[in-house]
Amino acid sequence: MAIREIISIPDKRLRRVSEPVEKITSEVRALAEDMFETMYDAPGIGLAAIQVAVPLRLITMDLAKKEGESAPRVFINPEILSKSEDIAVYEEGCLSIPEYYEEVERPASVRVRFMDLEGEVHEEDAEGLFATCIQHEIDHLNGVLFIDYLSKLKRDRVMKKFTKAAKLAAK
């Protein structure tokens, strides 16, 4: 297991649409393990493979409620089957947009289909934080960031800040 580098905006790879996982191999399992280690180290509650520069449709998530508990989950080739008309607002953050948080409106619940590391296909209803997180991470797989839901003014301001920081870091 290894902690991988999390890429951040303005890195253009974050806008890439990820490819489906064709077969669950030892490499896919190792990637999931690395992603958990990276996510816990950050720390975060969800991570898409593209955030560690691997363009595969794989998500790791841990929404454990209490300190010291763990509820690791892997979602391979996840897809949203249906969305509620009800809207929920959560303050979202992203490991690829460090230390920036903003309220985002999303469907309050979704039905999602995904495969686990054993190759089993599941369908599950997601509500609350789980619904927000799975939508946020699936967006990553499609090259969409949570700042895309903000006004153009806010989005441009965030991109300008991170682009400037990236240029300064490169010097």
From Swiss-Prot:
EC number: 3.5.1.88
Keyword annotations: Hydrolase, Iron, Metal-binding, Protein biosynthesis
Active site location: 137
Pfam families: Pep_deformylase
UniProt xrefs under InterPro entries: Peptide_deformylase (IPR023635), Peptide_deformylase_sf (IPR036821)
Enzyme class per UniProt: hydrolase
The keyword Lipoprotein is annotated on this UniProt entry: no
One BP term from GO: translation
GO molecular function: metal ion binding; peptide deformylase activity
Gene3D superfamilies: Peptide deformylase
Cofactor(s) needed: Fe(2+)
Comment on bound cofactor: Binds 1 Fe(2+) ion.
Protein's recorded name: Peptide deformylase
Organism: Afipia carboxidovorans (strain ATCC 49405 / DSM 1227 / KCTC 32145 / OM5)
Gene from which the chain derives: def
